[in-house]
Amino acid sequence: MNSEPKPGLAMSSHFMGTDNQDQYKGTYAMNRLSIANLLNSPSSTLPTGNDFQNFGLERQINEGVLPQLLQNPWAINFWLQFQNAQLQPHLQYAALACSLVTENPLDLSNKTMNMLQKIGVFNSVTKSEDDESVAPEKPVDESLNKSNILRRNYTVEDLTQAVEDIRQGKLGTRRASVVYGIPRSTLRNKIYKLEAEGAIPSKVRRGKIAARRAEAEQKRCVEATAAAALLDAFGNQSDSSSSSPHASMCPSSPDSTNSSLEGTGETPEMSDKKSCSPLDPKWLESIWQNLFKTQGNVVPVDSANISNVDTHTPTPISEKSQKMHGNEEWKRSRPKRGQYRKYDKNALDEAVRSVRRGEMTVHRAGSFFGVPHSTLEYKVKERNLMRKKKDCLYSHDSSTSEDGSQLVTSTISEKSDSSSHTSTPIPFPISLV
């Protein structure tokens, strides 16, 4: 009994042999690896034949080791010490993490990670993160350029082509942004910038405006000359009436015309040739209409005079007949519209009366009398508003009439009072001496 060792005594005299220790460590490591593999392996996979063999070997080893542990209590103590040595870092990390969380629950600084890194549990993880953080940083400009390149889906050539198309009037900003894939704001900013930098667009615009004005003046002069020629051909208007439109349309003296011809290097013959150019039929048609309006009826025309004016211009009667024929064809080809106002005015009045009396609703009266509901509702509202206005006017007139009658009665009463005062004789005492 005394020879048995006590479990509480020191283990100095009861160390296991080196072979037993190595065997125990090997089995322990194999058990830990198998548990880790089981935890890491997905649940859906089934164990293979090799796994069954490994399980069998581990079972045999455990069956061989467990009796030794039960027979030798010092082996159990060594096993517990080994487990504590393996779990000590994890326990320290858990205690430190709990203390940090309880002290500073919202501390997101690097202090906590530095404290945790003092323990050698996460050294590998921190080393890998440090290696990634030490990677050479790229300059900021390159990152910005990359972001700009990713944003831009167009080239500089597309931008210039789009701006040219917008300037020439081929495309608008909206259509150009869709065709070239450029934002509309970018196109606008580019156009504004180019207009602010160079004065070429303003000069071009001024030249276009001047050219348009010159064309308009030339058209007016041609109209005036055609009108004067037609009036001379008819002979119904006086010279003053024929010269006045010419002067009003082309206010230019002969001296000014000669100077202008000399400045441009043209001769009067060339200008006469230009003025005798074939006229536009639209202008002639407008002139004919104005002449017929002034004269009232159709005037007989000399064929010789009109042929002298212009042999290629068609007669107004033929033009009008062609126009009327074209209008008739257009009217025939046009699809027939829907018939509006199929209801009668009396039906509308009856429907309005029935709605205002409360006999029917708007919907029922409209369907009964064949009147659109919107029209009926509008008419009922209009009648109600008119009645309100009439009531207001009547009340105002009645109030004014009552006020006037009160004033008249008050003045009459005042006059009667004054007359009564004046008519009553004042008694004076008469003394007879």
From Swiss-Prot:
Q: Which Pfam families match?
A: HTH_psq (PF05225)
Composition bias, Basic and acidic residues: 320-332
Database matches in Gene3D superfamilies: Homeodomain-like
DNA-binding region of this protein: 173-193, 362-382
InterPro entries the UniProt entry points to: Homeodomain-like_sf, HTH_Psq
Comp. bias (Polar residues): 304-319, 396-408
Compositional bias, Low complexity, is annotated for: 235-254, 409-424
Function in brief: May act as transcription activator. Plays a role in neurogenesis by regulating neurite pruning between left and right AIM neurons and left and right RIF neurons during larval development. Regulates olfactory plasticity.
Q: Name one GO molecular function term.
A: DNA binding
Knockout or disruption consequences: The left and right AIM neurons and the left and right RIF neurons are connected by abnormal neurites in 40% and 80% of adults respectively. Fails to reduce chemotaxis to benzaldehyde after pre-exposure to benzaldehyde. In mbr-1 and cam-1 double mutants, normal neurite pruning between left and right AIM neurons is restored.
Q: Where is this region: Disordered?
A: 235-278, 304-338, 393-433
Q: What is this protein called?
A: Mblk-1-related factor 1
Tell me where it resides.
Nucleus
HTH psq-type domain residues: 145-197, 334-386
Q: Write the record's keywords in alphabetical order, separated by commas.
A: DNA-binding, Neurogenesis, Nucleus, Repeat, Transcription, Transcription regulation
Tissues expressing this chain? Expressed in AIM, RIC, AIZ, ADF, ADL, ASK, AWA, AUA, AIN, RIH (or RIR) and RIF head neurons and, in PVP, PVQ and DVA (or DVC) tail neurons, some intestinal cells, somatic gonad and vulva.
What are the GO cellular component annotations? Answer: nucleus
GO terms classed as biological process: nervous system development; regulation of transcription by RNA polymerase II
